[in-house]
Amino acid sequence: MKQKHLFLILAAVLLASCRGDDEVLVPSTWTQVAAPAQPRSVTGFYLLNEGNMGSNKCTLDFFDATTGYYRSNIYAETNPDVVLELGDVGNDIQTYGSKLYAVINCSNFVEVMSKADARHIGEIKIPNCRYIVFHEGYAYVSSYAGPVQVDPNARLGYVAKVDTATLEVVAECTVGYQPEEMAVVGGKLYVANSGGYRVPDYDRTVSVIDLATFTETKKIDVAPNLHRIVSDSYGQLWVSSRGDYYDTKSDLFVIDTRTDEVAGRLGIAVSEMCIDGDELYILGSEYSYTGGNGWDVSYAKIDTETRTVVSRSFITDGTDKEIQMPYGLAVNPETKEIYVTDAKSYVVRGTLYCFTPDGRKKWSVANGDSPAHVAFLKKGEG
């Protein structure tokens, strides 16, 4: 769940930890969006639709590259015995081994499914869970720890260590305030801390956790309200700051993991990013309460070796003008196709766009509310 423009409305929101009220959801549909293919490695992907906060409308879609069919809202039909389906606000989705993990933020659990068919396996109870990464048989889940509400006295967050064989939480490590995305590099877990509930007193640090001892060893001062973090092949971390939505703008920073110090600043807004080889793709949907109270949108690409912006718009055919609110971003590691989701108003069905590697629209398809997170499936995994 990204920071949408009604940030302060969280102060009035108290959400139940159960799966929410009964909803009439969009039924499963099949749409032919592409020609059947014979991929070498990537056979398709799952897409997690967040659903609007409080609506209990998180849904799961699947694209089968071998048939070219896109199937929406598959979870309910696949798991008819699961009460009230996926839950409230799907915040992340990843695969590891034979399992598919969906982080359901406002329902306070991680849904664990079979990667092969999305059948329910179990749940991992973690309050206000945010994102998930994996390393050597363990899942690491960031947690705000407290309820979903703006609170200047909000407690420190933590990272839960989960045994992927038993789905049990085996340890917790306290980090900064309202921790977000994480990345593993060289036996260390790096955690971007936002402090988003403590507005305007945001956190501005990246926590460094030694995975051997599962203890925080350092905090790296970066910028206010951190969010995204990804690693590249050069031992660098790319960390985004949302800024404060007033005078301090969203920005992108580089951390050298050999020294655990900030090594660069790009001066570019980031709301979502993903890495493919030496290319870092960026969506910039930056909101400001000053300068017109609106959104500034960009689609940039960065060379991670040289740390330079090589393109200010990776969409080259003008389709970007159709996209109301760019939200999710992914790049197929085999075909290099680029996927961008449009959340529109956040309370209506969104759209997924597929672009060729050179930025031309290939196809689009309707999704659920706030389509956001993609997990690719590869042959031979799990």
Predicted regions mapped to residue ranges:
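Positively charged n-region of N-terminal signal peptides that target proteins for export
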Residues: M1-H5
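Sec-dependent N-terminal signal peptides
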Residues: F7-L10
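C-terminal motif of bacterial Sec signal peptides marking the signal peptidase cleavage site
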Residues: L14-S17
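Predominantly soluble domains enriched in secretory-pathway, periplasmic, or organellar proteins
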Residues: R19-G382
